[in-house]
């Protein structure tokens, strides 16, 4: 372990967008220090070779993944890997005393049968998976504080669930009427080359993908079911937008009481998130924009009641790489360490 007073952490999967976002954010964290960067195809390369703009701040080489070496040097480890790889590493790291924060889908599900149905894979880690806590601090703050293994939420689920949670928890809506229309920037597809994320394909164009089969659907349904107290099936459709970062979700649901007003619902939301420093509930008539959240760990929420249709319209905006990924993972580690949850996390956007 490091002799530094700061907590040494490692990042496995340091060369992807999630990994580099973690590296950048951790440079500004007063209590955390990057002690290890791990990778597979990038092993042996200087981090500065991959990301020259961060080179002056982090003089580390990406190393081959060695669990014993990681445990010797790190108290906590972020797994920023493709789905299906974390569950081979997390049990060994936990056994060696490391706290583990997994940014993939591997530890997000209560039921591994649901995971297998949507993601595949032969899981042999059911006992370990049972100990994982879903890493959405605004809903599970106390559980996260006492956890050793965190399954960090996906980006679409983060934006969707923060918008839906108060309405579900307080019984404002009929859960079976939920429709989620969400948009994401191209960085959500990762750093590997994909045709639909090329500038010539994504520029000046908007299109849906994963219609009726996107993998984030069961994740959103799982937490909505927990919040409402019964099984929820909902409609979720994501779209790719011609921008680099950001997620915007517009969500529709039928109100149980058609006499509720926008002001009534805003009062519920403001009370629900009164102790949530990373969630900003906007005033009536102001609706979230992705630009406001860019570069921050904030989620902006707005809402409107449509008295004509008896529906509520919920709107949210986050930075998919920060509140939707790396920043939220750090927020969870802050809680696990007993620190203020927003410690070291940005709250001012890039503007314009």
UniProtKB/Swiss-Prot annotation:
Q: Which reaction does it catalyse?
A: N-acetyl-L-glutamate 5-semialdehyde + phosphate + NADP(+) = N-acetyl-L-glutamyl 5-phosphate + NADPH + H(+)
Enzyme Commission code(s) on record: 1.2.1.38
Q: Which residues form a coiled coil?
A: none
Principal subcellular localization: cytoplasm
MF-aspect GO terms: N-acetyl-gamma-glutamyl-phosphate reductase activity; NAD binding; NADP+ binding
Q: What keywords are assigned to this protein?
A: Amino-acid biosynthesis, Arginine biosynthesis, Cytoplasm, NADP, Oxidoreductase
InterPro entries to which the protein is assigned, alphabetical: AGPR_AS, AGPR_type-1, NAD(P)-bd_dom_sf, NAGSA_dehydrogenase, Semialdehyde_DH_NAD-bd
Which SUPFAM superfamilies does the entry link to? Glyceraldehyde-3-phosphate dehydrogenase-like, C-terminal domain, NAD(P)-binding Rossmann-fold domains
Q: What's the top EC group for this one? A: oxidoreductase
Which pathway? Answer: Amino-acid biosynthesis; L-arginine biosynthesis; N(2)-acetyl-L-ornithine from L-glutamate: step 3/4
Report which superkingdom the organism of origin falls in: Bacteria
| Pfam families in UniProt | Semialdhyde_dh, Semialdhyde_dhC_1
Q: Where in the cell is it found?
A: Cytoplasm
GO biological process terms on file: L-arginine biosynthetic process
UniProt-annotated catalytic positions: 155
Q: What Gene Ontology terms describe where this protein resides (cellular component)?
A: cytoplasm
Among HAMAP family, the record links this protein to: ArgC_type1 (MF_00150)
UniProt similarity note: Belongs to the NAGSA dehydrogenase family. Type 1 subfamily.
Q: What does this protein do?
A: Catalyzes the NADPH-dependent reduction of N-acetyl-5-glutamyl phosphate to yield N-acetyl-L-glutamate 5-semialdehyde.
| Stored PANTHER family | N-ACETYL-GAMMA-GLUTAMYL-PHOSPHATE REDUCTASE, CHLOROPLASTIC-RELATED, N-ACETYL-GAMMA-GLUTAMYL-PHOSPHATE REDUCTASE, CHLOROPLASTIC-RELATED-RELATED
Name this protein carries in UniProt: N-acetyl-gamma-glutamyl-phosphate reductase
Q: Which organism is it from?
A: Synechococcus elongatus (strain ATCC 33912 / PCC 7942 / FACHB-805) (Anacystis nidulans R2)
């Amino acid at each position: 372990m490091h002799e530094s007073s700061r907590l040494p952490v490692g990042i496995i999967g340091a060369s992807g967008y999630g990994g580099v976002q973690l590296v950048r954010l951790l440079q500004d964290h007063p209590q955390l220090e990057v002690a290890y960067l791990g990778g597979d195809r990038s092993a042996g390369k200087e981090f500065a070779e991959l990301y020259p703009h961060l080179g002056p701040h982090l003089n580390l080489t990406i190393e081959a993944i060695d669990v014993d070496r990681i445990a010797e040097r790190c108290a906590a480890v972020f797994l920023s890997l493709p789905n299906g790889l974390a569950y081979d590493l997390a049990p060994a790291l936990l056994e060696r005393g490391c706290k583990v924060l997994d940014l993939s889908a591997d530890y997000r599900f209560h039921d591994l049968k649901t995971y297998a149905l949507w993601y595949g894979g032969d899981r042999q880690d059911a006992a370990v998976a049972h100990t994982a806590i879903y890493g959405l601090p605004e809903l599970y703050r106390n559980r996260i504080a006492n956890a050793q293994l965190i399954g960090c939420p996906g980006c679409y689920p983060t934006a969707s669930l923060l918008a839906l949670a108060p309405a579900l928890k307080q019984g404002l809506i009929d859960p079976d009427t939920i429709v989620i229309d969400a948009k994401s920037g191209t960085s959500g597809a990762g750093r590997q080359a994909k045709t639909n994320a090329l500038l010539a394909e994504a520029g000046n164009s908007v299109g849906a993908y994963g219609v009726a089969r996107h993998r984030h659907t069961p994740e959103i349904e799982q937490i909505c079911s927990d919040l409402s107290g019964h099984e929820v099936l909902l409609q979720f459709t994501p779209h790719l937008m011609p921008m680099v970062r950001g997620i915007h979700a517009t969500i529709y649901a039928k109100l149980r009481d058609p006499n509720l007003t926008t002001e009534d619902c805003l009062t519920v939301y403001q009370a629900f998130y009164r102790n949530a420093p990373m969630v900003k509930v906007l005033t009536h008539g102001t609706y979230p924009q992705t630009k406001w959240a860019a570069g921050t760990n904030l989620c902006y929420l707005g809402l409107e009641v449509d008295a004509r249709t008896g529906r509520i319209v919920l709107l949210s905006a986050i930075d998919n790489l920060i509140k939707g990924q790396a920043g939220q993972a750090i927020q969870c580690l802050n809680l696990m360490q007993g620190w203020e949850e927003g410690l070291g996390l940005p709250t001012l956007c890039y503007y314009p």
